[in-house]
Every structure is written in structure tokens, then in C-alpha cells.
């Protein structure tokens, strides 16, 4: 990550090309890229921008999904919305833009790995959206969001994540409940067991999965509900 207090002219032009907007107030871009740990930077850090950007992103994605999936239920739209505004998706956008080359952080943050570093990348994307909103208005922010999210929104697999996570979000949105997993049977020898797990969602029919581990069986059961309810397209139909 860069250690310079502000972007060089070359870096600014490169990043603005990736964003699709030339900032009127150049310091807004610097602000959006500055983590709180980079305390020497006078423009402030991106924490307040992140708060605003999260709301702008949610609005634009909700509108995109509403217009794109005309027959989807509120619960189905909520699941897709949660996928598309997740830290994982925002971090993927950051990686696509190579934002790690421009983010300013303190020495401690530079050492972060895994989920914590993923969150930093995701936060910067949200702060960048806020900076665009402040610099050019909602249409400028929406143009950027569509540039990087529209393709993700219409992927056949709905930008699949963990099946249990997806099912929980759908169950909360549609029924206001949490899925319940039950181990019905464990069979086979210790070196090659088989777990039979049923998942129940109040308001929907249960499904069962059989796998070599309890977690894998839970995933299979969750996937079957998601595919049955049309939240996920069956894998066989995607080929």
C-alpha cells in the first residue's frame, strides 16, 4: 500500500479511470482511501464516508434488483441484496479495481490478513461510493455501482455464498425465523461415516442432506431448500 500522503497525479488518473469519474474536489478521493490508522493525513479518514457509502450502495442495489427481477418476492430480493452489499462482494470489487495499491494505512493495519483485511478493502469501497455521491451526486455514484455490480447481480448463481448463510438470510427476511438443523442419523464406520441432517424453516417444507460430515450434510440440506424456493438456480441447470 502506498505510503505517500496524497495520490500522485499518475495514480489519481489511473484510479479515476477505473472509477469512471474525475473528482471535482480532489481531496475527497484522498479522504476515501485513508484508514484511521494513517494518522498523519490531514484530510481525515474514511470511517464517516463508509457510513454514508453503505446507505448509498444499499439504495442503488435495491433499485437495481427491483428493476431486474420483476417477479422476485421481497424475501428473494432481500437475499440477493445481502449478497451484493456484503463485505465479500465489496472486497471483490476492491480487488478488481486493485485498490490495495492506493489505500493508506498505518503499519499495524498493513500486517492484517484474512477477514480483517477483507473488511478494510470492503470499507474503502463503501467510502469511495460516498465520496462519489458527495462529489457528483446520486447519479455519479449509481453509475459507478452499476459498473461493478450489475454483472454480479445477474449471474446465474446469484453470486453464491455459503448455503447456510444464504438460507438464514432468506428465512429471516421471509418468515422472521432462524433455520433449525437436526441430525437424524449417523451411520457407517468411524473412518467413513454418513450423517443425515434435516433443516426446518417455520413456514417452509423441510429438506434433508446426507454427507460424510455433519456440516456438509447441513450445506446439502440448506442448498435443497434454496434451490426448491428459487433462491438459487440448480447447479445442473447452469451448465
Curated annotation (Swiss-Prot):
An individual GO BP term: regulation of gene expression
Task performed by this protein: Digests double-stranded RNA. Involved in the processing of primary rRNA transcript to yield the immediate precursors to the large and small rRNAs (23S and 16S). Processes some mRNAs, and tRNAs when they are encoded in the rRNA operon. Processes pre-crRNA and tracrRNA of type II CRISPR loci if present in the organism.
Domain (DRBM): residue spans on this chain: 162-231
A matching Pfam family: dsrm
Keywords of the record: Cytoplasm, Endonuclease, Hydrolase, Magnesium, Metal-binding, mRNA processing, Nuclease, RNA-binding, rRNA processing, rRNA-binding, tRNA processing
Superkingdom of the source species: Bacteria
Cofactor: Mg(2+)
CDD domains assigned to the protein according to its UniProt record, in alphabetical order: DSRM_RNAse_III_family, RIBOc
Name of the protein this chain belongs to: Ribonuclease 3
E.C. code: 3.1.26.3
Reaction(s) catalysed (UniProt annotation): Endonucleolytic cleavage to 5'-phosphomonoester
Annotated GO CC locations: cytoplasm
GO MF term list: double-stranded RNA binding; metal ion binding; ribonuclease III activity; rRNA binding
EC supergroup of this enzyme: hydrolase
RNase III domain residues: 12-137
Membership in a protein family: Belongs to the ribonuclease III family.
Organism: Rhizobium rhizogenes (strain K84 / ATCC BAA-868) (Agrobacterium radiobacter)
Subcellular location: Cytoplasm
UniProt subunit comment: Homodimer.
Major site of localization recorded for this protein: cytoplasm
Ligand binding (Mg(2+)): 50, 123, 126
